[in-house]
Amino acid sequence: MSTIQPSVLRRQAGDMLQKAPYDPKRLVLIHTSVALGASLLVTIVNYILNQQIAGTGGLSGMGLRSVLSTVQVVLELAILVGTPFWEFGLLFAALRWARGEKADFQNLLQGFRRFGSVLALRLLRGGLFILMGIAVIQLSSTVFLLTPFSKSLLEVMEPVITAAGNPQQLEAILTPELLVSVMEACIPLMLIAGALYALIALPVFYRLRFADFAVMDGAGAVSAMVQSVRATRKKSLQLVKLDFSFWWFYLLQLLCVAISYGNIILPALGITFPFSEDMALFLFYVLGSLCQLLLLWQYQASVLTCYGLAYGAFGVRPPTPREQSLPHTATWNA
């Protein structure tokens, strides 16, 4: 298949999921419940620990505060580090659904079984985007300073530069109002940087879009990136079209996130609550999590299976046993 059609993929995904031996929605429900449950548990424990830390004062409580703070950091790191590997397990399940194979709870642990390759892929890809960000900052700063857009910033900073040798005068100038003026003057810089980063990073993002599936297919990190780049050559726009066909799904995900932060968003709009801030935090977090659980339970299996079908349609094939023993060998079915 040289061209993918979102409507065809959705129909094929529906057929595959109906024939699945183990209910895909049930598997997604288990996967999402574990992820949201762990996050909720850590949030509750952190709240309790914060109350304990606030109740310890003076030098006598310093040791206890240090221990409790360490526990908080460890719990947050565990969620931060573990969640991506858990998410990769569902990608592996989606790949099996797309191939008409059985996927069960054991497959959700595949991300941890492929720990080294998944970690290497995330580090390589993250490092690549960080380097692009640094390059964009340098380029956008140069463009900003060499154009009339920087005039406002130079005018705002002129008194600061003039008073650089006078600490008292400098202290009088450095006010919150000056900071606001600097931020407003930097808006063109941020717009230039955002536009340049999107121009550079988006094509790279789509060329590497199938690297996650390739890693779950047995490839090494470098091999997965190379396979994805080759398979999406001249086909990235098809992936963009596929993404846009699921606009409603991503919009509902954003809505779930917005609900989770309702305790911040609604007061900013002038809406007050008849209960405490802590209660508002807990209620909106639980409500947002429940909305996300329902959304993913209903639709995520279908969406991920569509991407799994696209992965196969783009000609990214599973590596042979010999290629799996050589994780840095690029493979691609031309």
Predicted segments, located by residue:
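Hydrophobic alpha-helical membrane segments
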Residues: 1-334
